[in-house]
UniProtKB/Swiss-Prot annotation:
<feature type="transmembrane region" description="Helical">
    <location>
        <begin position="16"/>
        <end position="36"/>
    </location>
</feature>
<keyword id="KW-0406">Ion transport</keyword>
<dbReference type="InterPro" id="IPR053952">
    <property type="entry name" value="K_trans_C"/>
</dbReference>
<dbReference type="GO" id="GO:0015079">
    <property type="term" value="F:potassium ion transmembrane transporter activity"/>
</dbReference>
<keyword id="KW-0633">Potassium transport</keyword>
<feature type="transmembrane region" description="Helical">
    <location>
        <begin position="141"/>
        <end position="161"/>
    </location>
</feature>
<feature type="transmembrane region" description="Helical">
    <location>
        <begin position="424"/>
        <end position="444"/>
    </location>
</feature>
<dbReference type="InterPro" id="IPR003855">
    <property type="entry name" value="K+_transporter"/>
</dbReference>
<keyword id="KW-0769">Symport</keyword>
<feature type="transmembrane region" description="Helical">
    <location>
        <begin position="58"/>
        <end position="78"/>
    </location>
</feature>
<dbReference type="InterPro" id="IPR053951">
    <property type="entry name" value="K_trans_N"/>
</dbReference>
<keyword id="KW-0813">Transport</keyword>
<feature type="transmembrane region" description="Helical">
    <location>
        <begin position="165"/>
        <end position="185"/>
    </location>
</feature>
<dbReference type="Pfam" id="PF22776">
    <property type="entry name" value="K_trans_C"/>
</dbReference>
<dbReference type="GO" id="GO:0015293">
    <property type="term" value="F:symporter activity"/>
</dbReference>
<feature type="transmembrane region" description="Helical">
    <location>
        <begin position="299"/>
        <end position="319"/>
    </location>
</feature>
<keyword id="KW-1003">Cell membrane</keyword>
């Protein structure tokens, strides 16, 4: 890692400041749309709140943002970057060598982040469109919630529909729009507080603690379920670290926090001034002069779309990382933008669209969605805390300090989890079921991979070098291909899957000029692209280890083309002159990739549980991307061969021959 790269990552700039506003803070920046509304409605309405309730609520919000977002994520988690990348899977790659069980919190955290995030577009866009109820001239239309739902669904259809084309063309406006959004939050909130400056007493944590145990708080500790809505975007802040750099987050977060806090204070001041008016509108929109509300709704809708876009892009990145870490099935990934960071996964896109649309149709109002929102993200934060503890110890923090610090955050987040648990019966069960389904898929995929590693037999390539040379020179066999390439998941030193040698020598002897054995290894660094070659003392057998970062596409032919050129230029691989070609001077022959698919047999070594794992994994494979697409082989010559999973199972089954009995009269 060069000093210049490190400096750029930690350095802030004006452009980086604006970009960070558009990428990092969409979720947490749109929380003022619905957080105060949730608090007031759960208390029984505007006319049921008191000054002490409002002060306590604002104090709880301020200190939640301070403890969780500022201290845990901005000051601690942002230092846990994996070569400038953040997020729970990046954090896991930093600590996974410490203990194999750490894969569990990583899978749970990733699954809950994905499941709860599916609600973000629904709740933010619906909340923004519901603001039209407060707009003179449009209120009579949008008092009918069906019209709100239709408008929301149209926006979601467009939003998810444009993902396949890339969002770079609209991404350029995200930063400026969010700058206007946060500026409006801050300015409007400040002017609303001018008549009730006592609201700033909420900075004192006494009011927060007092409200939790006050009889004026009708919900008791469960009020924290609504308070938590203010900080649900903190995990996304960490996940987007690699997109904007640590320095830009350090500089932009104080501005964002100030604007958000002023917005909450402004809404609180409006509530205090209008608690006897009987107005039951969302405080966020009601606190703005009526003539400005249509512009505010437009701005809020744009902010909601930007927040949703950040969530969708984050989900693609999260799934992509999980696939490369071999804890999630392979799905087709495309790159519609000009950079690797802008990716698109069609299956995930439309699953997210289906879940989001069903959420809108099932819950109908943002108030009902808020009742289910936030439960799963508390689990994500707890899992991040577990991984952070091991990271701090690994980096040299005294164990007692790491344990105490993370125990404090775990306690705070566990209290939020308990407070949010009531949401399970109000729709949170849907999010939990989705999270459990994702965890189940991750577990099956990970466990299936471990079972294969446990049972598949490996052989030493050196023991078969002579046979392969004889086959190469045996003109009795037709030339199968100039270059035959085998992709192996397991290749250590000269040991290789028995199924590959079985394919070359036994199934149908494959005569070629050069045999390639390629193994792709995913590294902890996000953007690594390196390789290591072993010619095994020959010019016809090549072992290639590709080391690719967990965010790099695994398009093997592109890398192999470069490797072949390097080997020929260095004289390690003979040139393959072509007699017939449309490319003058072409000295590289044709290639065929052989993919071996291992299928479960009734092998005796497998326990019933292991057989269930492998059969379930095989079922999941039917809806996933083929290895041919995953490795970028769709434009290459490919042969798919099926072999039984357990080639080492040679136990003889008992069977007797029936011998005819001679006729007694003969």
């Amino acid at each position: 890692m060069s000093d210049s790269h490190l400096t750029a990552f930690d350095k802030a700039s004006k452009a980086g400041f604006i970009i960070a506003l558009g990428i990092v803070y969409g979720d947490i920046g749109t929380s003022p749309l619905y957080t105060m509304q949730s608090l007031v409605e759960n208390q029984g309405g505007v006319n049921q709140v008191s000054e002490s309730f409002i002060l306590g609520s604002i104090s709880l919000i301020i200190w939640t943002l301070t403890l969780i977002t500022t201290i845990k994520y901005v000051l601690i988690a942002l230092k846990a970057d994996n070569h400038h990348e953040g997020g729970i899977f990046s954090l896991f790659t930093l600590v996974r060598k410490i203990s194999p069980w750490l894969i569990i919190p990583a899978m749970i955290g990733g699954a809950t982040l994905l499941s709860d995030g599916a609600l973000t577009p629904a709740v933010t866009v619906t909340s923004a469109i519901e603001g039209l109820k407060a707009v003179p001239g449009l209120s009579h239309i949008y008092q009918n919630q069906t019209n709100v739902i239709i408008t929301t669904l149209v926006i979601l259809i467009v939003l998810f529909g444009i993902q396949r084309f890339g969002t770079g063309f609209i991404g350029k406006i995200f930063g400026p729009v969010m700058f206007i959004w946060f500026s409006f939050l801050g300015v409007s909130g400040f002017f609303n507080t001018l008549g009730h400056l006592e609201i700033f007493k909420a900075i004192n944590p006494y009011y927060a603690l007092h409200l939790l145990f006050s009889p004026e708080n009708h919900r008791g500790i469960f009020i924290l379920g609504s308070i938590f809505l203010a900080t649900t975007g903190a995990e996304a802040l960490y996940s987007d670290l690699g997109h904007v750099g640590r320095g830009n987050i350090y500089v932009s977060w104080p501005f964002v926090k100030m604007c958000i806090v002023l917005s909450y204070c402004g809404q609180a001041a409006w509530i205090l001034a209008n608690k006897h008016s009987g107005i039951e509108l969302n405080p966020f929109f009601a606190s703005v002069p009526s003539q400005l509300r249509v512009y505010l709704v437009s701005l809020a809708t744009l902010a909601a779309i930007i927040a949703s876009q950040a969530l969708i892009s984050g989900s693609f990145t999260l799934i992509s990382e999980a696939m490369r870490l071999k804890i999630f099935p392979l799905f087709r990934v495309t790159y519609p933008g000009a950079n690797l960071g802008q990716l698109y996964i069609p299956v995930i896109n439309w699953i997210l669209f289906a879940v989001t649309s069903c959420t809108v149709l099932a819950f109908r109002t943002s108030a009902h969605m808020e009742a289910a929102y936030g439960l799963a993200i508390t689990i994500t934060m707890l899992m991040t805390t577990i991984l952070l503890k091991y990271y701090l110890i690994k980096k040299g923090t005294r164990p007692i300090l790491a344990h105490l610090a993370m125990a404090f955050f775990a306690l705070v987040e566990f209290i939020f989890f308990l407070a949010s648990a009531i949401k399970f019966m109000h729709g949170g069960y849907a999010v939990v079921i989705l999270a459990l389904a994702i965890v189940f898929v991750m577990f099956i995929w990970h466990a299936g991979t471990r079972i294969v590693f446990k049972y598949v037999k490996s052989l030493n390539l050196n023991d078969y070098k002579e046979q392969i040379k004889q086959l190469r020179d045996d003109v009795c066999f037709d030339l199968y291909q100039t270059n035959v390439v085998y992709l192996s998941n397991r290749m250590q030193d000269h040991m290789i899957d028995r199924s590959i040698l079985y394919s070359i020598l036994d199934k149908r002897p494959k005569r070629a000029q050069v045999y390639w054995f390629v193994n792709v290894q995913v590294t902890d660094e996000p953007y690594t692209a390196k390789y290591k070659v072993d010619m095994m003392g020959t010019d016809y057998m090549v072992r290639v280890n590709l080391y690719l970062g967990f965010r790099m596409p695994q398009t093997v032919p592109r890398y192999l083309r470069t490797i072949v050129q390097d080997l020929m230029e260095s004289g390690r691989l003979p040139k393959q002159e072509q007699e017939y070609t449309i490319t003058p001077g072409r000295d590289v022959g044709d290639f065929r990739f052989v993919l071996i698919e291992e299928r479960v047999t009734n092998a005796r070594q497998l326990s019933n549980f292991e057989r269930f794992i492998m059969q379930t994994k095989a079922s999941i494979k039917h809806v996933t991307a083929s290895p041919m697409r995953w490795f970028g082989l769709q434009y290459s010559e490919v042969t798919l061969e099926v072999v039984p999973l357990i080639l080492s199972d040679v136990l003889k089954l008992p069977i007797k021959e029936l011998v005819p009995v001679e006729d007694s009269e003969a």
